[in-house]
């Protein structure tokens, strides 16, 4: 809440606002006025991530269309060069090429129960932070995490969960990974998913404009060679994307004849 935000700022905490952009809020969040309001309140950074329809109450109707994903990216790049507030994203390198932090090894996720998961929306684990070997060794030597990184990097520069939930299920079954949710329905939720586009949209890359983001991403948030030896079918993906964009574009109206 805004009141909670004010309390954090008054306490002198490094404070940011993370937003899950979806169909019902994209028009309000992708505005310079919203960022200016946060700056006026003293917020240090904002984080735009896009809604991913996963979990027990997934709502595909809220997910952004491919052209809206591009719109979010363009807005972030433009505002980074215009307004005095840090803007975080986790999906692109300095050239605007898509990447997945899990695939590149930048991050994994520790769930509430202590399970070391590939990423926040893959709620399965083999290892635990209570591993007597220590967290570092448990993550470094995990065949489960290694296979996930390699599978994801091999299949897409985007989100393997959104694009290929079937492969996620296969890998979970292969390793006998446990469901880390309290509800115990993560596998059924994977089965219920429909493949969709994620941040990998070949031909729609938007490079960073601001020198600071361009340099920092180039050296500290790159793909670290995860995709170096992978020949993705970017041309095929681009064709699929253009077909999708053409199918969803508003049709031109023929003017009435007198």
Where are these regions (language model features)?
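Solvent-exposed, non-transmembrane amphipathic alpha-helical segments
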Residues: 28, 35-37, 58, 63-68, ...
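Long, low-complexity, intrinsically disordered segments
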Residues: 223, 234-258
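Radical SAM enzyme [4Fe-4S]-AdoMet core and its adjacent flexible, acidic
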Residues: 2-99, 103, 112-113, 117, ...
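Generic low-complexity, intrinsically disordered sequence content enriched
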Residues: 6-9, 143, 219, 245, ...
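C-terminal accessory region of radical SAM enzymes
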Residues: 67-95, 120-174
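Cysteine/selenocysteine-centered motifs that mediate thiol-based redox chemistry or coordinate metal-sulfur cofactors
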Residues: 141-220, 224-229
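Alpha-helix initiation/capping motif
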Residues: 22, 31, 65, 91, ...
């Amino acid at each position: 809440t805004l009141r909670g935000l004010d309390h954090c700022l008054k306490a002198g905490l490094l404070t940011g606002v993370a937003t899950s952009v979806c169909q019902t809020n994209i028009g309000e969040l992708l505005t310079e006025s919203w960022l200016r309001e946060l700056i006026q309140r003293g917020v240090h950074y904002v984080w735009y991530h896009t809604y991913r329809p996963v979990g027990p109450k997934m709502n595909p109707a809220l997910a952004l269309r491919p052209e809206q994903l591009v719109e979010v990216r363009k807005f972030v790049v433009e505002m980074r060069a215009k307004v005095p507030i840090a803007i975080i994203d986790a999906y692109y390198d300095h050239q605007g090429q898509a990447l997945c932090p899990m695939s590149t090894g930048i991050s994994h996720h520790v769930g509430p129960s202590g399970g070391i998961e590939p990423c926040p929306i893959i709620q399965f684990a083999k290892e635990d932070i209570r591993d007597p070997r220590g967290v570092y060794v448990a993550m470094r030597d995990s065949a489960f995490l290694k296979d996930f990184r390699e599978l994801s990097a091999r299949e897409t520069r985007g989100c393997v969960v959104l694009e290929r939930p079937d492969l996620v299920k296969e890998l979970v079954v292969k390793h006998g990974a446990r469901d880390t949710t309290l509800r115990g329905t993560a596998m059924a939720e994977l089965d219920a998913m429909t493949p969709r586009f994620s941040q990998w949209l070949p031909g729609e890359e938007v490079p960073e404009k601001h020198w600071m983001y361009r340099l920092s991403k180039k050296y500290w948030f790159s793909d670290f060679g995860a995709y170096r030896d992978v020949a993705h079918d970017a041309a095929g993906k681009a064709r699929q994307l253009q077909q999708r964009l053409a199918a969803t574009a508003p049709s031109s109206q023929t003017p009435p004849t007198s």
